[in-house]
Amino acid sequence: MEIEEKDIGAITACEMLYPEMANAFREVQAEQYTLFCRKQMDYGPTNIALGRDLAIKENKQFSHQGLWFRMNDKISRIQNLLWNNKEEYNESLEDSWIDLANYSIIAMLVNRNKWGK
């Protein structure tokens, strides 16, 4: 995505007013991308596309439904850990937040017909 002229001021102001937060945001994005790439090597694109042509509206909708279920699982896990003060056993709470964010980005890639390409 190219940065539009109108957004440069907001980006500059954010980085000046909140330098630690802006840098930490970029670090989290790098962690997200690294985790996405590692998992992509394990799963491949068919776990989202289910071997279907996502250019077809019904297949894309089916893919979105699958993503919704995965996101709902993560939200339920986060809710259980936070609201019930549960101890983390399998993956950290932070990993769940990153997974949830990555599923949102994957949904955007499906929408933009970029998944698996």
Where in this protein do the model-derived segments appear?
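Intrinsically disordered, low-complexity regulatory regions
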Residues: 1-117
